[in-house]
């Protein structure tokens, strides 16, 4: 079911792109005068408040867009970007002492309002990237005991995505040792900016992390000890939430991105991604990767055509 949303854009925000999500317009009073400029966008569901409409009509610092969208992050992000003709958004934030409780926030990485000025600056050569998250087993590599690459074309195609400025993340539900061994066997480690393993089921407590002596892996490997904002019973299967990926990118100083894509053989792992590319399982090597690369590239081209070509300068 679609909801009616209001999104305000601060014309002279100090920190561009970040979105503050409120439960109601009156909650702006909790922000504090100095923090107004932390957020270019303020988003909330509309309840027909005359106070809200009247206040915005007389406030020259903000421009207002109203739209109808489902209460999910893909739809909300799409409508905000379309309404304000922007291809890039920053972090989604909530008030620490009165956080909004919309469904779209359930599995999206959110910051509290006071954390925005504490964010690390971008330290790598990524300028508003597309993010592509890859599964490992039966997606990039075979299911054989002695693993092989699915298709030698993968090496050139991952390089192509990197050359286009994409951030590449590997997320496998295999053990850390399995992931490290498999990546070494097929020489894929250098292609990824971050590597995540384990975390396929809900646990009552985080699993112990195993250290690795592989220095190349250490520079990219990220612990999977994340908490999920979902009511999953212990042992329940979990999707590959963008929340984890966005947190990792923030830790690396990447606070803005265009789209986020999941490439995986299991549709159940898809949760709130902008794009999902479903690949056929590969128990043994196949020479079929180019079709998936073309789908990834077509999605990115579609995105840039939809948002970037219409962006507000």
From Swiss-Prot:
Domain of life: Viruses
InterPro entries with a match to the protein in the record: DUF705, HAD-like_sf, HAD_sf, HAD_SF_ppase_IIIC
Disulfide bonds: none
Database matches in Pfam families: DUF705 (PF05152)
NCBIfam families for the chain: HAD-SF-IIIC, viral_ppase
Protein's name according to its UniProt entry: Uncharacterized 36.0 kDa protein
Organism of this sequence: Orgyia pseudotsugata multicapsid polyhedrosis virus (OpMNPV)
Organism classification: Viruses, Viruses incertae sedis, Naldaviricetes, Lefavirales, Baculoviridae
């Amino acid at each position: 079911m679609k909801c009616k949303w209001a999104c305000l854009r601060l014309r002279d925000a100090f920190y561009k792109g970040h979105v503050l999500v409120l439960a109601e317009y009156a909650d702006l009073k909790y922000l504090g005068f100095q923090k107004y400029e932390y957020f270019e966008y303020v988003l909330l569901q509309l309840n027909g408040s005359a106070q809200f409409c009247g206040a915005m009509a007389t406030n020259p610092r903000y421009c207002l867009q109203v739209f109808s969208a489902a209460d999910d992050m893909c739809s909300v992000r799409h409508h905000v970007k379309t309404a304000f003709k922007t291809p890039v958004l920053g972090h989604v934030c909530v008030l620490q002492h009165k956080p909004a409780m919309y469904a779209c926030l359930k599995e999206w990485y959110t910051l509290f309002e006071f954390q925005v000025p504490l964010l690390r600056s971008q330290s790598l050569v990524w300028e508003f990237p597309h993010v592509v998250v890859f599964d490992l087993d039966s997606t990039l590599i075979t299911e054989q005991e002695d693993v092989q690459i699915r298709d030698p074309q993968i090496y050139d195609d991952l390089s192509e995505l990197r050359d286009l400025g994409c951030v590449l993340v590997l997320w496998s539900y295999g053990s850390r040792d399995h992931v490290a061994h498999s990546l070494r066997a097929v020489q894929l480690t250098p292609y990824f900016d971050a590597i995540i393993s384990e975390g396929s089921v809900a646990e009552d407590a985080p699993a112990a992390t195993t250290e690795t002596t592989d220095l190349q892996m250490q520079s990219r490997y990220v612990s999977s000890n994340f908490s999920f904002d979902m009511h999953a019973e212990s042992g329940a299967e979990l999707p590959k939430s963008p929340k984890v990926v966005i947190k990792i990118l923030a830790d690396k100083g990447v606070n803005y991105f265009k789209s986020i894509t999941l490439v995986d053989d299991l549709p159940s792992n898809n949760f709130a991604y902008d794009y999902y590319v479903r690949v056929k399982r590969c128990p043994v090597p196949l020479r079929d990767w180019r079709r998936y690369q073309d789908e990834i590239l077509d999605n990115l081209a579609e995105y840039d055509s939809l948002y970037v070509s219409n962006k507000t300068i």
